[in-house]
């Protein structure tokens, strides 16, 4: 075979190889282009999915916060309702306790004719005070204590050699408080002190 024939055959082979390479390159470029398009589509779908997840997350957080607020408001409403009901009950109970107190004051525990009545009323009063104490109702009996304007209401002042100045010398009506909040002040007579004591003055409410 002549040199020209060999060269011609080599040229044909080279052209075939170049054609196949060119076709393969074109196919590869097309596949890469399609892959890039697919990647962009997937990235877009992922971004949309993440946005929806974030939106749903915010919705869940807002819903949880709203539920928590509703629970707190409901608990506060229940607490207020219970407090109002308990305060109303306690105020309605005060006349009953006052009547028991007056019954004890009007009965002589040393008199055999009224001794059993006194003991019965006293026992009932103690039982009632013990029962209401469980709900926060406490009696204010400041006999012999220093006058406290936050808990006591003075109806008058009198000189006294027995009680120091500004001391409760007589409780006219006992007071009551509910969970440390004043329901009714104790009505008291306050000592001005004796001749050898420094006299005291306080504001007396009508």
Swiss-Prot record:
GO CC, any one term: cytosol
GO biological process, one term: protein folding
Gene3D superfamilies from the UniProt entry: 3.90.20.20, Head domain of nucleotide exchange factor GrpE
Keyword DNA repair: no
Matches recorded under CDD domains: GrpE
Annotated localization: Cytoplasm
First-listed, main subcellular location of the protein, grouped into a coarse class: cytoplasm
GO MF annotations, alphabetized: adenyl-nucleotide exchange factor activity; protein homodimerization activity; protein-folding chaperone binding; unfolded protein binding
Keywords: Chaperone, Cytoplasm, Stress response
Pfam (any one): GrpE
Domain of life per record: Bacteria
Coiled coil (residue ranges): none
Subunit structure comment from the entry: Homodimer.
NCBIfam families with a match to the protein in the record: PRK14139.1, PRK14140.1, PRK14150.1
General function of this protein: Participates actively in the response to hyperosmotic and heat shock by preventing the aggregation of stress-denatured proteins, in association with DnaK and GrpE. It is the nucleotide exchange factor for DnaK and may function as a thermosensor. Unfolded proteins bind initially to DnaJ; upon interaction with the DnaJ-bound protein, DnaK hydrolyzes its bound ATP, resulting in the formation of a stable complex. GrpE releases ADP from DnaK; ATP binding to DnaK triggers the release of the substrate protein, thus completing the reaction cycle.
Protein family (similarity comment): Belongs to the GrpE family.
Protein name: Protein GrpE
Taxonomic source organism: Shewanella baltica (strain OS155 / ATCC BAA-1091)
